[in-house]
């Protein structure tokens, strides 16, 4: 059995005597307040003071209890009745309403309540809260809803739900009713998220929240968490305190939010009360000292006024009301009703006053009549009244001119919060940032862009760095947005000026301006070491296949020239001496032996010529076509030789995304939270899908938390890691020391960076126009040149570019020297062989010459010399062939 916390705030007779003056005309009033209703109790006390009169005083007896506990309610009610109270003010819920109404009807004790109206007729129950059914149905018809979800709290009763379902059956509405009253508090957040995700699958984007403030706030928190508070969603808060909830966090999301308001803050009576209410001490009056008041507290305050007015009217009518001593036992059998309870009930129902909740008047059943409920909508500049509902006029729309979503006139006195991210060269901390304050601490492309945007739009701004250091992505499980997108979605920032990629999923929850920069996903790798030229790099201008063909062509031409010279009679001639005498021999000679043919072809190929030339037409044809061939080959070789010898080349292991996907030696990854990762995750292109499969399953993880971490990983991986990032950032890092990264291949896609604002923000259109104007003025290009190239550290053209023209080094032409040295060495070797061979032959000849039997006296020295010359000449190919 739960123990009742009985507070005898029975303001003691001495204390109340000090407040109201000592008087015997004390009217005992009971009070049943639920735990946690601090503001309602403060409003009750303020009403007691405010409406006190010199004629009589209301003396309260207060009990704090769990209104859902029927036993506790019974015990408290009987305790109040035994004290001799004239009426009881209090709260109930679905579980205790029948207990209270039963006691009131049996004992004739009036019960004044701000709780939800009950169905049917309950004597002695005075309902301070107006019925919302008519206003809600009128609003549904006004918005022309024919399909929606209805979330209700069963603790508030089911009368409103029943009215909606009855109308749905009549008008063929599709209503999905969901009870959220029995959700476990420990798992409420998860349950709410799951609930709205299920509604999303059913395309339910129109929702009625028939709940009290605390539950509405809990639901709204989860709606924001999963991004269901954006354009395309519409919520109706079905209670009388539209402004009671925390609307600021959903104000800029873009969703339509409507509701009802019973307290009109434009009313002079309410304004005067708020002036006094806001000056009360919080310690003495918990929940006070605010510029607003909950509608349940306002109804509590009005209830005190109704009770005061009722007893005043009884005194004016000279109806004596008294309860002397103990009123008796409420559980007596049979029950003994209070004889004067009927008079008090009648007096209460006859009260007609103006209160914080407007005109207060009751019908014969104790229900409010002739009341007016304001219809509210949440705009970007706050809650706004669009009309009202009354029993007579029904719904009347009074707001004919809606505020423009492009209006920025209210920004002059507001400091716009600009969220951004530390990312070079967009936003960087200045070197002396510790000595600076505010926006002066930062520099970069986006810092300059923010200043220009603010200048064109005419607002003050404050730069803030996103807390988690992320751009913005939605968690697959919790559906929570992080990064800068999350700060916009959840109302922590007014605008995001950063390298934020425009994507579909982001566009669903925030608004983007026109792109201020175009880019695409690119590949960053560590710049490979310059390839050292080989010893025979002079052969590189022509492929090895061409060199082989040249060798075969050289041999083939030489052989053909040799054969042609043998068959053509015009290549044969008789040798003559210098004195004109012919040789005595009848044999003819041919200069194009096999060795001379090879020598002629080699001389022509080297463009150096030769001592001999073809005499016949056929030989000259062979020589001509060979000269033409060598002309083209040598010209092509010379043209390429300069580039190959003077340009240093870097051999990249990969050149495209296809190269990455086909290999496993080089790991590759993206930023862990951003549009690049989303691009690969959503891509249906085979190459990119294959890359995503690898990245998702790679161990260790190939994803990095920041771009700086990704660049550092590229630099430290010794060419074993490639980082996929936006091309603009890739180009910028390539310009920064130590100049050891490079962009390879083309862009994988095409996209743009945009300035983001919350859905429906008044800043959206103004920012968009500012971006277009800056683009037309060429300022965006100037800013990029300033931060990318003018401040580059690797020189123009990308620093140590892929190809750099420089002076020739020895390594470039070392092979030529090797061939020269080799040729000289070979020549010396051949000369030595020739010398040895000739010496041996000469020795044999001399030996024969010394033999007396072979001495020919008629031989002269001249004949010996000629023979020696001819023999030596024949070594190089001059031959006598007899045909």
From Swiss-Prot:
Pinpoint the site Interaction with the cone snail toxin Con-ikot-ikot: 474, 681, 773
What residues show lipidation of type S-palmitoyl cysteine? 610, 836
Specify the protein's topology with respect to the membrane: Multi-pass membrane protein
Family classification: Belongs to the glutamate-gated ion channel (TC 1.A.10.1) family. GRIA2 subfamily.
**What does UniProt say on post-translational modification here?**
Palmitoylated. Depalmitoylated upon L-glutamate stimulation. Cys-610 palmitoylation leads to Golgi retention and decreased cell surface expression. In contrast, Cys-836 palmitoylation does not affect cell surface expression but regulates stimulation-dependent endocytosis.
* Keyword Glycoprotein listed: yes
Keywords in alphabetical order, please: Cell membrane, Disulfide bond, Glycoprotein, Ion channel, Ion transport, Ligand-gated ion channel, Lipoprotein, Membrane, Palmitate, Phosphoprotein, Postsynaptic cell membrane, Receptor, Signal, Synapse, Transmembrane, Transmembrane helix, Transport, Ubl conjugation
Induction record = Down-regulated in the pyramidal cell layer of CA1 in the hippocampus by global ischemia.
**Span list, region Required for interaction with IQSEC1:** 867-877
* Descriptive protein name: Glutamate receptor 2
Cited Pfam families: ANF_receptor, Lig_chan, Lig_chan-Glu_bd
State the organism of origin: Rattus norvegicus (Rat)
Extract the InterPro entries matched here.
Answer: ANF_lig-bd_rcpt, Glu/Gly-bd, Iono_Glu_rcpt_met, Ionotropic_Glu_rcpt, Iontro_rcpt_C, Peripla_BP_I
Domain topic, free-text comment: The M4 transmembrane segment mediates tetramerization and is required for cell surface expression.
UniProt feature coiled coil, ranges:
none
Give the CC-aspect GO terms: AMPA glutamate receptor complex; asymmetric synapse; axon; cell surface; dendrite; dendrite cytoplasm; dendrite membrane; dendritic shaft
> Could you state a single Gene Ontology molecular function term?
extracellularly glutamate-gated ion channel activity
Positions of the record's site feature: Crucial to convey clamshell closure to channel opening: 654
